[in-house]
From Swiss-Prot:
Entries under InterPro entries matching the protein: Acetyltransferase_Butenolide, Acyl_CoA_acyltransferase, GNAT_dom
SUPFAM superfamilies referenced in this protein's UniProt entry, alphabetically: Acyl-CoA N-acyltransferases (Nat) (SSF55729)
Pathway connected to this protein: Mycotoxin biosynthesis
Protein's recorded name: Putative acetyltransferase FG08082
Gene3D superfamilies: 3.40.630.30
Induction of expression: Highly expressed under trichothecene-producing conditions.
Biological function: Putative acetyltransferase; part of the gene cluster that mediates the biosynthesis of butenolide, a mycotoxin that shows antibiotic activity but does not seem to play a major role in the spread of head blight in wheat. Butenolide is derived from glutamic acid via a 4-acetamido-2-butenoic acid intermediate.
Keyword set includes Acyltransferase: yes
Keyword terms, alphabetized: Acyltransferase, Transferase
């Protein structure tokens, strides 16, 4: 189970996936959110984005700024200035029964090396440790195959228990399209 109070880290080559909120780079995240790549989001005032990030479990993807690594293993300290944020998976959750994935991205120049699959595999392993998890949801247009293959997600209408169920939502003033 993901320990919400204790950051966890995974490394592969020059890349790091971390749940450490101290590594999150608001300016980099906002730049991605305001890009065409993350068309559904849009940037936020820095303080509002920090509030959203702190209220979520964030799996940040970072690339080492230099080739000098400061060690390996669980005792390694990761310093924000040594890493460039290049991706994010943000999960809004109660930490027990439900999660909602949003703000999922990897910058285009860092795509294609299996890093998206790696991030989703880490997330999947974390979710498997939640004994009372009922469901994880997300909205997607053309990436369902990626989430299906790596997380086992399906269109909600494919679940037997969802026959006749409608998904309801209301858009707020900050909704982006």
């Amino acid at each position: 189970m993901i320990n919400i109070t204790k950051p966890q880290n995974w490394t592969r080559g020059d890349y790091l996936v971390s749940t450490d909120p101290a590594l999150l780079q608001v300016d980099a995240i906002n730049a991605a959110l305001s890009s065409d790549m993350v068309w559904w989001a849009g940037d936020l005032p820095a303080d509002a984005l920090w509030d959203a990030l702190r209220s979520s479990i964030c799996f940040g993807l970072y690339r080492k700024r230099s080739s000098e690594m400061n060690g390996t293993g669980p005792t390694v300290e990761y310093k924000i200035e040594e890493w460039e944020q290049v991706g994010l998976v943000r999960m809004i959750t109660d930490g027990v029964t439900f999660g909602y994935l949003t703000d999922v991205y990897i910058l285009p120049e860092h795509q294609g090396g299996g890093r998206g699959r790696w991030m989703l595999q880490i997330l999947n392993e974390a979710l498997q440790g939640w004994p009372h998890l009922r469901r994880v949801m997300l909205l997607t247009t053309d990436k369902m195959h990626l989430f299906g293959k790596n997380l086992g997600m399906k269109d909600y209408r494919e679940f037997d228990g969802m026959k006749g169920v409608s998904i309801a939502m209301v858009e707020g003033p900050g909704a982006q399209h």
